[in-house]
Curated annotation (Swiss-Prot):
Residues that bind Mg(2+): E170
Organism, as annotated: Thermosynechococcus vestitus (strain NIES-2133 / IAM M-273 / BP-1)
GO cellular component terms attached to this protein's record: cytoplasm
GO terms, biological process: isoprenoid biosynthetic process
Record-given protein name: Isopentenyl-diphosphate delta-isomerase
Entry keyword annotation includes Metal-binding: yes
Gene: fni
């Protein structure tokens, strides 16, 4: 069974692409260099007398009705290959242990190669936490309808479906799917038809307030701004490209996008009641705290957790523990007893 799967993965273009994406995200120099997340432009106002017991700081939050031990999401990144399957299982076990949310990488491959379903089959590893299914929104224009979306939700036993918007990646990717016409209407149909919430995210170029409002108006339950400042998928596709002109195209757009902090601030101002996820270049608990103070309900990290999980399950657990300790320290040193208090106390200042 395993050898047959390996042969399929080698011979399948979509699986070859998945393997290349995973390798580059683990080992490649694919981060934005010139554009930053924008979080460095903010600083917390220190509270010398917090009037708190550090041991009593409570990181628990609710998001979309889910009760979580901390406001943290292991963001969508991988799936569809044996290596990705093992990484997903490690991510799921640690997410379950920590009581946080986990998203998987795009499940489009399941619709073309159902035999790779085991690489996404992680509910056994994570029986009680929210799991997020994932599909490129553009696939709604390439044969994926409500039934296909329901199928990938069911296969993961997911609590929500993420639709990712990646126009730049598709534009610079060799053979990318570039027809984004009419997607908003189809997203609305999907939101009304599925029994689970639909979350829409970018992949590292950001969602503007205008686009976020359009999405919420058709029924999207939450927005993951997924801004610029972390992984540049234009760089990833440039590194993969075999054709020189395609490589140049990817490199030309390597620094394209809206910084994560700017997205978050603008979207929250326009849609103060919409649940928001902040992802895109967050690196530590201080960035997570800044995202929460700017209005996010959850903070998502992908590449840092992916790299730790590739090393070992223990390395991943330690990475998350450190991040949560950093977050607690920010709460303590701002006099905030809970993550919600970071926002309520208005203790983040632009510098």
């Amino acid at each position: 069974m395993q050898s047959n799967l390996g042969t399929l993965l080698v011979n399948s273009p979509i699986e070859q692409r998945k393997a290349e994406h995973l390798k580059l995200c683990l080992q490649g120099d694919v981060n934005h260099q010139e554009i930053t997340t924008g979080f460095e432009k903010y600083r917390f106002r220190h509270c010398a007398l917090p009037e708190l017991d550090f041991a009593e700081i409570d990181l628990r939050v609710e998001f979309l009705g889910w009760r979580l031990a901390a406001p943290l999401l292991i963001s969508s990144m991988t799936g569809g290959t044996p290596q990705a399957g093992e990484i997903n299982r490690r991510l799921a076990r640690v997410a379950q242990q920590k009581g946080i949310v986990m998203g998987v990488g795009s499940q489009r491959v399941l619709l073309e190669h159902p035999e790779v379903a085991t690489t996404f089959a992680i509910r056994r590893e994570a029986p009680t936490i929210p799991l997020l299914a994932n599909l490129g929104a553009v696939q709604l224009n390439y044969g994926c309808g409500v039934s296909e979306c329901q199928k990938i939700v069911d296969l993961l036993e997911a609590n929500a479906l993420i639709l990712h918007l990646n126009p730049l990646q598709e534009a610079v990717q060799t053979g990318g799917d570039r027809n984004f016409k009419g997607l908003l209407t189809k997203i609305g149909v999907l939101c009304r038809a599925l029994p689970v919430p639909v979350i829409v995210k970018e992949v590292g170029n950001g969602i503007s307030a205008e686009v976020a409002k359009q999405l919420v108006d058709v029924g999207v339950a939450a927005i993951d701004v997924a801004g610029a400042g972390g992984t540049s998928w234009a760089k990833v596709e440039a590194a993969r490209a075999q054709d020189a002109s395609q490589r140049y195209l990817g490199d030309a757009f390597a620094e394209w996008g809206i910084p994560t902090a700017h997205c978050l601030e603008q979207v929250h101002t326009a849609l103060p009641d919409t649940p928001l996820i902040a992802s895109g270049g967050l690196k530590d608990g201080i960035d997570v705290a800044k995202a929460l103070a700017l209005g996010a309900g959850l903070a998502g990290l992908a590449r840092p957790f992916l790299q730790a999980a590739h090393q070992s399950e223990e390395a991943l657990a330690q990475r998350i523990d450190l991040l949560l300790e950093e977050l607690k320290t920010v709460l303590f040193c701002t006099g905030s007893a809970t993550p919600q208090a970071l926002y309520q106390r208005r203790c983040l200042e632009r510098i």
